Amino acid sequence: AYLINKKEFWKETFYVNKDVLIPRPDTEHLIEEVIKYTYEDSKLHILDIGTGSGCILLSILRERKKFNGKGIDISKKSINISRYNAKKLKLNNRTKFYISDVDNFLIGKYDVVISNPPYIENLSLKCLDRDVINFEPKLALDGGKDGFSEIIKVINKTSALIKKNGLFILEIGSNQKNKVIEMLKNKGFYIKKVLKDYSKNDRCIISTKI
């Protein structure tokens, strides 16, 4: 995908380069779940934490014509790419992208929050496929010493910004389910279900704010 600077994801083709993760088919589960839990004509506000190329947020906005979305990413290069993709898909009138880390983002209240944060622990990064570790941005993969450092920040921020009964969809590592569920419950989230990926690993937790 990096060689041709494009990648098909959901129903669109997105511009990508070495500054963003290549969208994975497993991540399309996030979009399916948002569609499943929302109405087509609903006017909802959605936040994408760690937006990267913008592919998740923009795919949802293509399916939900009355949604408005915001995406944040700590990488300026990523935000430039997400803005480019929004313009290319004619969705820039319903999206805003911000260069920001999770802790310092204070804008808005949201009906839906989605996030695919870095969740790979430091030591495991060395064991990844060579194509991944050599070409994809470490910033988007590195979840800190135990793999939870960014997940904790995302859960804390979502708890502050999500509306009551709001939908939170979080992608996780295959061995992180139990600890993340505990974190979510401690922050006042009700666990609706855990989704598996195509390899039958736990991959997404769907919850709502009580």
Q: What is each model feature region?
A:
Residues 86, 116, 132, 154, ...:
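Conserved RecA-like P-loop NTPase ATPase core
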Residues 34, 60, 132, 154-158:
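Class I S-adenosylmethionine-dependent transferase superfamily signal
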Residues 91, 136, 162-164:
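Helix-to-beta-strand junctions that scaffold the AdoMet/dcAdoMet cofactor pocket
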Residues 119-150:
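Mobile active-site "lid"/loop adjacent to the S-adenosyl-L-methionine
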Residues 145-208:
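Conserved Class I SAM-dependent methyltransferase catalytic core
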Residues 29-127:
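Conserved SAM/SAH cofactor-binding pocket of Class I
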Residues 1-37:
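Conserved AdoMet
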Residues 13, 68, 94-96, 190-193:
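Conserved beta-strand segments of alpha/beta enzyme cores
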